Amino acid sequence: MAVVLASPAAGGVAAGGFVVRNLDLFYGTHQALHQISMTIPERAVTAIIGPSGCGKSTFLRCLNRMNDLVPDARIQGHVSFRGQDLYAPGADPVEIRYRIGMIFQKPNPFPKSIYENVAFGPRINGYDGDLDEIVEGALRRAALWDEVKDRLRKPALTLSGGQQQRLCIARALAVNPEVLLMDEPTSALDPIATGKIEELMTSLKQEYTIVLVTHSMQQAARVSDYTAFFLDGRLVEMDRTERIFSTPSDRRTEDYITGRFG
């Protein structure tokens, strides 16, 4: 893995937790990402937008090495978080994924109780403290405690779709991550459940770095502090969200946001 360091991106983006430089990703002979360079600030919501197939989710998976699990995937370039090269020899992908959690498009609770879903991560990591405290704290941070506190031993699959997604967020929070990667976390949810997840993101960014892939321009505008526009596996531009949506630097960004394509 080549390590290529550079100064943070221009355009009002603060120095932050992730530094990505000259990132290429290949699936076999197909190149999915081309020379991505960006800085993702800590304790903010950064939205990744762009048309289907532009590389948004592929890029997101580079941030916690989920692409390692894809056959024939190959990566070149530099990805670091808080100064640690995530692809350095000896870097532990499992430890990285605990620090940098992932929330998927479709809620994926384990076929266990609500309690056991949240307790699972700390338990397999050998936590010997008060699991009840961990579970309650994670559920409170995920804004789910008041809805489930009287049925913690009930199957997680009895929850609504929106509740299941917040349970998955609580499960990620239970192992004390530093980052939440969210891959279209509300695309399968109704407007009310979507609103609760968006409120949760706004609350959680006080403690966590959040990177959000979304197809919804309205959602990106509502919840994100920074927005990056991807097209054909390339980063077109990244800036503060209000500037991206009001005065983007690139005509292609304006065309996408205004619905001329995508």
From Swiss-Prot:
One GO location term (cellular component): plasma membrane
Localisation: Cell membrane
Cited Gene3D superfamilies: P-loop containing nucleotide triphosphate hydrolases
Primary residence: membrane
Keywords: ATP-binding, Cell membrane, Membrane, Nucleotide-binding, Phosphate transport, Translocase, Transport
Catalytic activity field: phosphate(out) + ATP + H2O = ADP + 2 phosphate(in) + H(+)
Listed EC numbers: 7.3.2.1
Superkingdom of origin: Bacteria
Domain called ABC transporter: residue spans: 18-257
Record GO terms (molecular function): ATP binding; ATP hydrolysis activity; ATPase-coupled phosphate ion transmembrane transporter activity
Binding site for ATP: 50-57
Membrane topology: Peripheral membrane protein
Entries under InterPro entries matching the protein: AAA+_ATPase, ABC_transporter-like_ATP-bd, ABC_transporter-like_CS, P-loop_NTPase, PstB-like
BP-aspect Gene Ontology terms: phosphate ion transmembrane transport
Catalytic class of the enzyme: translocase
Family: Belongs to the ABC transporter superfamily. Phosphate importer (TC 3.A.1.7) family.
Cross-referenced NCBIfam families: 3a0107s01c2
Subunit text: The complex is composed of two ATP-binding proteins (PstB), two transmembrane proteins (PstC and PstA) and a solute-binding protein (PstS).
Function: Part of the ABC transporter complex PstSACB involved in phosphate import. Responsible for energy coupling to the transport system.
Protein name: Phosphate import ATP-binding protein PstB 2
Species annotation: Symbiobacterium thermophilum (strain DSM 24528 / JCM 14929 / IAM 14863 / T)
